[in-house]
Amino acid sequence: MIETIASKLLVQNVSQYFILSFILLGIGLFGMMVRKNLITILMSLELALNSVNIAFVGIDRLNHLIDGEIFALFTIALAAAEAAVGLGIILSLFRLRKAENVNEIIDLKG
């Protein structure tokens, strides 16, 4: 009896992780599609990546393994490096071309 109640609560908690993950993923994808500012697009991308991390932790809690948390930490480190490179590119574009929006970057030629 107690085991079934505990398993129902665990499934309910895991479903809450996935609901939160899908909401954050939707907000991140919406921000990437609608916004024109490069920094806002980068923040939306980070939000979408963090939603995937929440899903990894939810899967980890369901299976009682630590693999999801390790993968989430690895993804956080990778996202930090990606954000640093992205901000560097955005700052150099702003310094050289005064380009803040995506529409101003489309005209760049290599």
Swiss-Prot record:
PANTHER family cross-referenced by the UniProt entry: NADH-UBIQUINONE OXIDOREDUCTASE CHAIN 4L, NADH-UBIQUINONE OXIDOREDUCTASE SUBUNIT ND4L
Name the record gives this protein: NADH-quinone oxidoreductase subunit K
Family according to the record: Belongs to the complex I subunit 4L family.
Keyword terms of this UniProt record: Cell inner membrane, Cell membrane, Membrane, NAD, Quinone, Translocase, Transmembrane, Transmembrane helix, Transport, Ubiquinone
Lineage of origin: Bacteria, Pseudomonadati, Aquificota, Aquificia, Aquificales
One biological process term in Gene Ontology: ATP synthesis coupled electron transport
Annotated compartments: Cell inner membrane
Transmembrane intervals: 14-34, 39-59, 70-90
Physiological role: NDH-1 shuttles electrons from NADH, via FMN and iron-sulfur (Fe-S) centers, to quinones in the respiratory chain. The immediate electron acceptor for the enzyme in this species is believed to be ubiquinone. Couples the redox reaction to proton translocation (for every two electrons transferred, four hydrogen ions are translocated across the cytoplasmic membrane), and thus conserves the redox energy in a proton gradient.
